[in-house]
C-alpha cells in the first residue's frame, strides 16, 4: 500500500540491502524508512515535489499511476528521499477509499504479523487488516486518541542511507487520551520519553497567552512530539503532521518562499528552537525548526 511503495523507490535510488532483524517485540527498521503520506490533487503533485526538494534537497522518483488500496482506486504517486525525511506523495484521480488519507505516516516493520501483534497488545486497533501489494503487505492501525498510522513490510528489504536530521511526527491529542497514547506507543515502539513539559509555551501552538503539555518521544521509528491541547487551535496548528529540522531556519524559509511555499507564521523561539509553519503547493503544511530539543 501507501508507504509500502518505498520499496518501489528503492528501485530508483538503491539496491536491496541486508536482511531485516525479526524479533517478537522489536519491529522497527529505521527512521529513514518511515514515509510521510502526502495527499494532493493530481494537478499539484509535481508542484509540491519540486517545491519540497528545492527547499530541503533530495531526489524524487518518476510519476507512476497505480492502485495502492485494497479496494479499487487509482492514484499518481511519487516518492521523495531527502536529507530531512522520506515522503510518499499521492494524487488520486478517483475518490480515496476510506480510511486512506487519514493515516499520517507509513512505518516499515521487519515482520508484519509480529508488528500487528505488538500494536494490538499495546492498545492499538487494526482498522485496515493486512493486504498484499506487489512488494509485500500493508495495514493501518489506530492508537488511543484516534492517531492513525500505516505499517508496511517488504518482501525484499530496501536500503536507504541514514537521514541528516530525523523528522518529528507531530501528534495532537486531548488531555483525556494523551497518557494512553504515550503508553501504547512506547510499548509498541520500545521508545522513551525524552521530555515531558507540562507548561510548554503556547506560542508553539498559536496561543501565546496560554501553556500546554508537550511530550517528546524517540524510538527506532524516529522522533515524535505529542501536543496535548484543548483543541482551541488557530489555523494552521493541528493541520501539520510533521516537523522538519534544518541547520539554518532563515535560509530554509527563503528557499521555501522562492519555491512557491507560503510562510504561514513568523519564526518564533521556544523550547530551545526557532520554528515556523509553512504551506507547500498542494496545501501540505509543515513545521520547520532549527536547533533545540
Segments predicted by a language model, with ranges:
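Core segments of cupin and vicinal oxygen chelate
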Residues: 27-30, 37-84, 129-143, 171-222, ...
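Bacterial N-terminal signal peptides
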Residues: 3-16
Amino acid at each position: 500500500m501507501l508507504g509500502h511503495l518505498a520499496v518501489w523507490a528503492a528501485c530508483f535510488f538503491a539496491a536491496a540491502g541486508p536482511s531485516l532483524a525479526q524479533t517478537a517485540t522489536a519491529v522497527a527498521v529505521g527512521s529513514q524508512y518511515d514515509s510521510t503520506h502526502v495527499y494532493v490533487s493530481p494537478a499539484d503533485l509535481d508542484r509540491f515535489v519540486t517545491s519540497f526538494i528545492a527547499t530541503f534537497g533530495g531526489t524524487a522518483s518518476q510519476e507512476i499511476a497505480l492502485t495502492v488500496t485494497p479496494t479499487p482506486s487509482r492514484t499518481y504517486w511519487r516518492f521523495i528521499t531527502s536529507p530531512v525525511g522520506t515522503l510518499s506523495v499521492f494524487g488520486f484521480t478517483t475518490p480515496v477509499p476510506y480510511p486512506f488519507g487519514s493515516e499520517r505516516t507509513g512505518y516499515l516493520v521487519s515482520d508484519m504479523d509480529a508488528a500487528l501483534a505488538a500494536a494490538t497488545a499495546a492498545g492499538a486497533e487494526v482498522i485496515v487488516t493486512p493486504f498484499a501489494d506487489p512488494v509485500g503487505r500493508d495495514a493501518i492501525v489506530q492508537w488511543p486518541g484516534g492517531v492513525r498510522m500505516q505499517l508496511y513490510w517488504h518482501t525484499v528489504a530496501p536500503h536507504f542511507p541514514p537521514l541528516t536530521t530525523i523528522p518529528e511526527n507531530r501528534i495532537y491529542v486531548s488531555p483525556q487520551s494523551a497518557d494512553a497514547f504515550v503508553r501504547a506507543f512506547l510499548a509498541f515502539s520500545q521508545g522513551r520519553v525524552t521530555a515531558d513539559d507540562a507548561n510548554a509555551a503556547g506560542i508553539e501552538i498559536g496561543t501565546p497567552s496560554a501553556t500546554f503539555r508537550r511530550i517528546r518521544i524517540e524510538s527506532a521509528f524516529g522522533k515524535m512530539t505529542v501536543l496535548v491541547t484543548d483543541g482551541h487551535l488557530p489555523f494552521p496548528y493541528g493541520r501539520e503532521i510533521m516537523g522538519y529540522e534544518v541547520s539554518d531556519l532563515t535560509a530554509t524559509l527563503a528557499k521555501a518562499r522562492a519555491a512557491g511555499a507560503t510562510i504561514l507564521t513568523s519564526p518564533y523561539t521556544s523550547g530551545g528552537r526557532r520554528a515556523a509553519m509553512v504551506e507547500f503547493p498542494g496545501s501540505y503544511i509543515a513545521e520547520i525548526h532549527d536547533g533545540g530539543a
